[in-house]
Amino acid sequence: VVAVKTSEFEPGDITAFYYNNKLLVRRVICTGGSQITVEKDGSVLIDEQPLDEPYLTEKSIGQCDLEFPYYVQPGNVFVMGDARAVSMDSRLTENGVIPTDRILGKVLFVN
């Protein structure tokens, strides 16, 4: 994984971070200070506006135990994997949102 260190993230950015000593690559869906809703069909709303996700081939609610709408606190990001049906990500309270200071950077390349 090649990543550029930064503290500024936007929806759509691909990030790398460690979770339980394992390197994970996930996409930022919602940044701190915003509210996210994931509908039953997998559609995502940020502050009640539909999120355009042209990178997805299939939408899915996947594994999720959060109640929506969910407010993302400043200094955190809500991440999801592109393989929504099977991704372990911020939709699970076990994983939760990711503090931006734990993110290694924006991913440029994955080998």
Where on the chain are the PLM-derived regions?
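Non-heme Fe(II)/2-oxoglutarate
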Residues: 109-111
